[in-house]
Structure formats: C-alpha cells, structure tokens
Amino acid sequence: MKELIEYRVNLMKRLEDVAKAFRAECLSVKDPYTPLEGESWNVHQIAVHTRDVDKLVYGLRVHRTALEDNPEFSSFDGEAYMAEHYDPKESLSALLNDFVSSIEALVELLRGLPAEGWSRLSRHTTLGSGLTLQTWVEKSLAHIQEHLETVKKANNK
C-alpha cells in the first residue's frame, strides 16, 4: 500500500509540474500562430485543445468518477470540438493560466480523496467498464505530456 500511495503522490506532483512546464513552453514560442512542422495545429491551437480536454474530458471524468456511482462517458472528438469552438483571438497567457489553475484545483480534489477514492469505477462507451479514477488521472497526465513534447520540438528547431 505504501508504494501505491507514493505513486499517487508522485502522480499528482507530475500532473502539476507538467501543466506548468506546458504553460512555460507554450509562452516561450516566438509566434504561437506559426504552423508546426508535421502537425495540423499551431501552438495556440494545441494550448486551447489541451486546456479544453482537461476541462471537458479528463478533468470532468475525474470529478464525476469521484462523485458519482460508476458514471458512463462517451468519446470526445477533439478535432470537431476545435472546429466549432476555437477562437484564435483568445489570449494565450490567459488560457494557459486558466489551464494551470484547473489542474491545481484537480490536484486539490485528489489530495482530499481517501485511498479508495482513486479506485472508484467508471465506464466508457468504447473503452468499456472498470475504468478507475486513477486511470483518468494517468490519461490526463499522458495527454498533457504528449502536447508538451510537441511544443518542445517546435521550440528546439
């Protein structure tokens, strides 16, 4: 049990750290509207997408799994959502600060959970059943990390 607790504490720290690193990396890009090589989006679009997926997908799934009995989630089409909701005029700094604040609030929720809260179950229309709250936290971290690496590559050109 000690190792599991340590893993979860580390997971929360990594989630906060990667969110802050993502913000810093995005803000260090000279022109966030320049298309990225090999990518369909620019840094501003990636930042908006990452913030929206935190709020509408992984963050929401963590919250609902913590509060509801075995909630069911449907798939999220990030491309379609961006096509309909993307605002290129949205301040990059403001949206990234909003993103980091959202992650910090999520971590506060996680810190307040009893150990068994991390094992609460949920379902997904295509992924099936038995998905724990911890699974959604891990997927959130992986999603942010993936986009952080993309932005880092753009910065290291």
Predicted regions and their residues:
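Generic N-terminal initiation segments characterized by hydrophobic and/or small/turn-forming residues
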Residues: 12, 107-110, 138, 145
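Acidic/histidine-rich alpha-helical segments that form the ligand environment
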Residues: 14, 18, 23-27, 81-119
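Short, helix-capping/interhelical loops that line the mouth of catalytic, cofactor-
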Residues: 1-10, 56-99, 157
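Short, contiguous alpha-helical
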Residues: 32-78, 122-157
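Amphipathic, non-membrane alpha-helical segments in soluble helical-bundle scaffolds
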Residues: 5-16, 40, 44, 89-96, ...
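Alpha-helical bundle segments that constitute or directly flank the non-heme di-iron/ferroxidase center
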Residues: 3-31, 53-64, 139-142
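Short amphipathic alpha-helical segments, especially helix-boundary/capping motifs
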Residues: 8, 19-24, 35-39, 79-84, ...
